[in-house]
Amino acid sequence: MLLLTGATGSIGSRLLPRLLEDGREVRCLVREPRRLGERRVDVQIALGDLGEMSDPYLVRQALRGVDTVVHLAATIRDQPPRRIEELNGLATVRLLRAAERGGVKRFVFFSALDAHPAQRTRFFRAKWLAERAVASSPLQTSVFAPSIVYDRTDPWITLLRRFSFLPVLPVSGDGQAAFQPIWADDVARCVAAALRGELRPRYELAGPETLTYDQMSDLVSRIAGRPRPLVHLPLPLVRSGLIALRSVFGEAVFATWEEAELMEVPMLSRRGTADVQALGVEPRRMGDVLEEGT
């Protein structure tokens, strides 16, 4: 039995069908089973989310009979009263410790490229803390560290498309942070392939091209048929503006400062696409993927 968290996200929704095609029994830890769509009848359901990892009964039940955990679930914004640090860092440690006690053999954790303790963002620092715990576990563990992951309909791409209806395309900061964007489906194929064999301690997942945030923003607007000039907004203005908007609109706000700040952090792998290709996946270029969805 495999426990999958984050099954309704960009990566999880593409990984789940591949796990089932491989003949795996899957249990999904989800808050809203209906979001699994027609796949919900093919899996076992454990009701819960990252914020409930402190409930020992819930976690114990979710792990019952499980030999492999694939922990995809994460958040890049606070979910009051819980904060990014608890939802990404502490929740992972709680799940990991419960897996150790529950007889789980393999634990796969999704981190991010360039996560380390001196990073400017809370998200990356929380991911680094979780990585350290996973690496020191007695279980057979594996950390997948991708660059920025995208899909045709994910919130980030959708927001850029909406911005392209404006006369100009707003970009926070200088837009020069560099990424190696990788398609969610390519990531899912990598995980499925890795699970079929002996897991390596770490995989760095990067796409075939290096693009700045400016270049990605321009690419999305052009493919949407609405190329726009980019206007760079000073970070202090972005920060104060997004904090003010969140105080008014709460969780309905279109973006948070924490999310905007992530676009200032480069996510590059010195290995390039080597780890992806070693798993038998030829990663696709961002423009090719997005054009197929138009």
Predicted regions and their residues:
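Conserved glycine-rich Rossmann-like NAD(P)H-binding loop of the short-chain dehydrogenase/reductase
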Residues: 24-31
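SDR active-site strand-loop-helix element
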Residues: 5, 29, 69-73, 107-113, ...
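Conserved beta-loop-beta element that borders a ligand/cofactor-binding pocket
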Residues: 111, 132-155, 159-162
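Substrate-positioning beta->alpha
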Residues: 94, 155-156, 173-195, 201-204
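Short alpha-helix in the Rossmann-fold core of NAD(P)-dependent oxidoreductases
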Residues: 85-89, 108, 127
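Mid/C-terminal beta-alpha module of Rossmann-like enzyme folds, strongest
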Residues: 190, 194-256, 266-294
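NAD(P)H-binding glycine-rich loop region in Rossmannoid oxidoreductase-like domains
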Residues: 34-94, 98-101, 113-117
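N-terminal Rossmann NAD(P)H-binding glycine-rich loop of SDR-like oxidoreductase domains
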Residues: 2-22
